[in-house]
């Protein structure tokens, strides 16, 4: 109980649906050279990582490091996503709020990118992942990082790609702020 209270007081709670700080999986701070976003943004772009899924903090942190390393090899400045959703129902901070991602060319300067860890071309994400994404969006609106009148789209709506997977895209189409075009 004391440890849990200490974590909550420090803002590091690991309860389901809460944001796990970047520092828990990546010791490297975000470069000050990465541009800031003009907030609130009006667009949320949903992705899937097409990696192995993860179902506990240790697995998810390993996958996050692999994704960041892959993005860096591809000459990104850092991990490309603002946030990632683990199969454990946790929200993992990538670049976080207010930092310009590298997840959807032509839209990076006006959006945040949320990636579901795994491949959702063949199946739907677990319900805890979907709920975590909804929670993150609520947090983003409450913190005035995302406009209350935001549009929600899948990555495939910004370029020719299968991302975020057909099952996840079909689910997103049921969400209230989903739009057919960015």
UniProtKB/Swiss-Prot annotation:
InterPro entries (alphabetical): Amidase/PGRP_sf, Amidase_domain, Peptidoglycan_recognition, PGRP, PGRP_domain_met/bac
Top-level EC class: hydrolase
E.C. numbers: 3.5.1.28
Coiled-coil boundaries: none
Domain N-acetylmuramoyl-L-alanine amidase: 40-165
The family this protein is said to belong to: Belongs to the N-acetylmuramoyl-L-alanine amidase 2 family.
Protein name: Peptidoglycan-recognition protein SB2
The organism of origin for this protein: Drosophila simulans
Phylogenetic placement of the source organism: Eukaryota, Metazoa, Ecdysozoa, Arthropoda, Hexapoda
Name of the gene this protein is made from: PGRP-SB2
């Amino acid at each position: 109980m004391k440890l849990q209270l200490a974590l909550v007081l420090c803002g590091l709670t690991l309860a389901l649906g809460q944001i796990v700080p970047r520092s828990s999986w990546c010791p490297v701070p975000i470069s000050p050279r990465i541009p800031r976003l003009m907030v609130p943004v009006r667009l949320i772009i949903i992705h899937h990582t097409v990696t192995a899924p993860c179902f506990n903090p240790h697995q998810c942190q390993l996958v996050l490091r692999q994704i960041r390393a892959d993005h860096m090899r591809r000459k990104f400045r850092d991990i490309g996503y603002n946030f990632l959703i683990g199969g454990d129902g946790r929200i993992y901070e990538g670049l976080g709020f207010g930092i310009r991602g590298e997840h959807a060319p032509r839209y990076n300067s006006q959006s945040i990118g949320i990636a579901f860890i795994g491949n959702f071309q063949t199946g739907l994400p677990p319900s805890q992942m979907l709920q975590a994404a909804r929670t993150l969006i609520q947090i983003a609106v409450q913190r005035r990082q995302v406009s209350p009148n935001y549009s929600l789209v899948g990555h495939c709506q910004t370029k020719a790609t299968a991302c975020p997977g057909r099952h996840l895209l079909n689910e997103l189409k049921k969400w209230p702020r989903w739009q057919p075009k960015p």
